[in-house]
Amino acid sequence: MKELLVTIAAGLVDEPEKVTVDVDDINDEGVIVYHLHVAADDMGRVIGKQGRIAKAIRTVMRATANRNDQKIMVEIA
């Protein structure tokens, strides 16, 4: 899952070497939290107009997680 998120984000940004993902352990609600970090200049590319790109990334990640019976949340920082 982490590799998928890095691959998606790296394809969107100008500085793919600065894309990192931190993963939190499962919280009390059974949710795994992924923290996506990109360069400040690339933040707009990852979020997109009105958050459309961010929503699409979260949708793909949730669909993949559902196939594995997991609950996830993606935070972009």
What are these regions (language model features)?
Residues 1-45, 49, 55-77:
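RNA-contacting regions in translation and RNA-metabolism proteins
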